[in-house]
Amino acid sequence: MVRNALAAAVLSALLSGPVLAQEASPPPPPPAPTDWRAISPSDLLVIDTSKGRILVELAPELAPAHVERIKLLAARGFYDNLAWHRVIDWFMAQTGDPLGTGDGQSWYPDLKGEFTFRRGPDMAFTPVAAPTGALIGFVRSVPVQTQPDDLMAGTGDKKVHGWGLYCPGVAGMARDEGNDTANSQFFLMRQAYPALDKRYTVWGRVVSGLDVVRALKASPTPDGIVTEPDRMTRVRLAADLPQAERPTVQMMNTTSAAFRALVDQARQAKGADFSVCDIDIPAQVTPGA
C-alpha cells in the first residue's frame, strides 16, 4: 500500500563534521520592492491544521496533472479534517487518506507519475550551481536539477529533462509500489531526503509554515503511524477563499540581485558542503482574516 511504498525510504542518521570558523561576512543590503514577486492566488494552497497554517506554492510546470488533482480535491473539500496519519521526524509528514490508515484514496483514477519534466528556454529557471553535466536551481520556489541549456539544440522538442529535489518543505505525492498509482495522498518534507528524487512526483513547496510541518505530531515508531494525529482542518486554494480571508505571499524573486546575494552568502557559509537545500527563499506573508 501507499504507506509501505514510502516506508522503504527510512531516513539514515545524519553525521556532521567539525565546523571551521570563518570570518563573518557583511549582511547583504535589504531587498528592494522590485526584488519580490507575488504568488498567484490560483497557485497558493492554504492548508489550515490543528497546529497552524501551511502555505504551499504549486508548481504546474513540474507536475501539471498532480497540481490539477490537488486543486480539484481542495475545491471539493476532500482534504478537510483528514489526519496527518504518517509522520516521521527528520523525514516527512503524510496525509490525504480519508481512511486515516495509509490505504485510502479519492474516487478519482490514479495518476501517471510525473517524476521528471521538460524544461525549455521559455521556462523561468534560476541556476545556482553547475555541477558537471547539470544545472541546479529553482523553478518558482521549488529546487530542481536539470540538464544544461546547451543540450536543448539537440533534442526534438528543444527541451531538456529536469526533476524536483526533495529539500525541506518540498511537496510530493505518495503512491503505491507502481509508478502510476498516486491519487490523493501527499507528503511535505520536514528535512531533505535526496533518495526520493525522481521516484516521487514533486508538485510544490511550502513557502510559509515549515515550522508547522515540523510541529505536527510524529510517530515514536519507524513506520511513522501516528495515534491521535494532528489534522488538516481546511484546505483551499487562496483564490477560492473570500477576499477578506485570503492570504497573500510575496516571494523574493530568484532573478533579483538580492537573491544572488543570498545565494553567495549561503555558499560562503557552507563552503564545499553547499547545497541548494541550504537556500531559504524569503517570503512576506499577509495572513488574511
Regions found by a protein language model. Give the residues of each.
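Bacterial N-terminal signal peptides that target proteins for export
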Residues: M1-A7
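Bacterial N-terminal signal peptides
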Residues: A7-G17
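Cyclophilin-like peptidyl-prolyl cis-trans isomerases
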Residues: A21-A289
